[in-house]
């Protein structure tokens, strides 16, 4: 107060004001502060002070020929005085206004192309909807987020090469454009930017925005995709939030979202196959997301999610060193531990063999809806500070931390037997057994944990076993906080190894990820995911399996046909027929298979006729291990659309319908493709006419001597076999019919069989 009075007193004297306003500042320290270094110390003041001058801008001398000396109002636009220290002229801000209104027009065609990201942002905001503002405490946690909507996913180096190639194509310097995306973008941009007058530097900056993912570590409550992050300043403050729905989506968010869905589907499917790692790699390599190969996306996309990281590990890529348990990402922030196998008894006296972490450690736990800080010693939870969106999310985090602590009271809280299995029907490891058990019901766990009196600490509150908040008591060591726990900020990646059961370990052998950690959440992908692997046919249900199986046969008919006649066993064992087996009722699979294989053998041998449609239709049934029985079937059942549907052995059905005139096959009403050769061709060429009374058995067989001409055939006795030369110099093996009754069919059969034998 005294100082203020003193100052007021000083100011009331007229001389003081004069001294302060008129005297020059010549204190050395001040002069030094504002003049040393090239960095402007007070930019906004400098700007205001400059703009208050009459001619704050300098311009090239040529401007005096392009701009009049005075505008319509008679105000001077430029000074006749030269700028001190350069040969430029001094210009008034009014000159800029004049130029904007009356200056030359240039073509604006390139602007939307160069400033694409800005134009798109304006569109998104224009069509976005802002909802009401709510005032409430915001639990924000820092997460690494994408701040640049609408970008491709090139690495900085790849983008640099593309930019140099597009903007400065004639500059010297080694540039290697290797990836498909690099080449596509370069070609596209070169075409777009022909005759572009915008400065190359500006073009380069804007291209960088379009090509590279930029991430920042920002406090976020709510959506983390880039279209939300670009309006972060509008949607959440310290004590308020505003609802917002983006007015458009961007490809990079869609890629991230679709990649997670594809990876989850692939890991879940691989986990139940005979060789999970090989299957996973096969699927990753044969899958496309939005038209781009999944493996290319995995190499470039930094998304960290359990399934995505398992796929990356399988491809030998580095991943984050944090590990996953119970859907939370754990990152050790201090301490260390050694692992030791220990046997313990549950409350149900079941023995569990658990790898115990011995030593003091601190972790951050980050989940989708809750975060926590955990301090633990050997089999002891010391402290857990949780924050989350709601009671349910907080409870989830507490359960995971309690199981992770490996405390005895947690193991003793198990009621009943632990026998949880994974998708492949294998028992889960003990830690996941415990986790599943308590996720189902944590009442006993919370009740047995113990409670304690708590001190009043700002921003922290206790939580009771029934999850109600309390200021006096809390479950032992557990507190709920208003503040979130930040995600681990470092983006370091480490080399990992993966075993055939998809368990990912760091170099010290700690398990970072396993298929148990992959979320079961189902979502709908934003971009089309094309799984070419037959293992993924069942992802869209039984109908998809049916259609895909038959489409595969039709697409590969040429090779299938040859295998059918020469090496059927190999054909029956093809993995493409595996998914189909799940559609055939278990009890009858073996009989169907035996029946179809016998039928096929008859076709190959003497009796009956070769019928393409029938082979295609029945082939998938022959893949199951056959049971020998004398049973005959006129129709075979498949389980689709919630019930058994019939496929007729001879003739069409709603499930399998072949149209002879259009040559199109429809499965359950869906188009399954065209057969290139018509199975029931009635063309009787010379051969079929002459070969009436003979059965074509297959390719030439040298044991039956040199090829006869068609005319020499008449000398054969019934049942005798011979090689015969037909049509275009091809040789086939034939046999003279024993009975004349079947002669009629021969001319139709012959054409087909000749074609089969030749091919």
UniProtKB/Swiss-Prot annotation:
Gene3D superfamilies listed in its UniProt record: Polymerase Basic Protein 2, C-terminal domain
Principal subcellular localization: virion
Cellular localisation: Virion; Host nucleus; Host mitochondrion
Subunit record text: Influenza RNA polymerase is composed of three subunits: PB1, PB2 and PA. Interacts (via N-terminus) with PB1 (via C-terminus). Interacts with nucleoprotein NP (via N-terminus). Interacts (via N-terminus) with host MAVS (via N-terminus); this interaction inhibits host innate immune response.
One GO CC term, this protein: host cell nucleus
Protein name from the UniProt record: Polymerase basic protein 2
InterPro entries, A to Z: Flu_PB2_2nd, Flu_PB2_6th, Flu_PB2_C, Flu_PB2_CAP-bd, Flu_PB2_middle, Flu_PB2_N, INV_PB2, PB2_helical
Secretion signal span: none
Gene: PB2
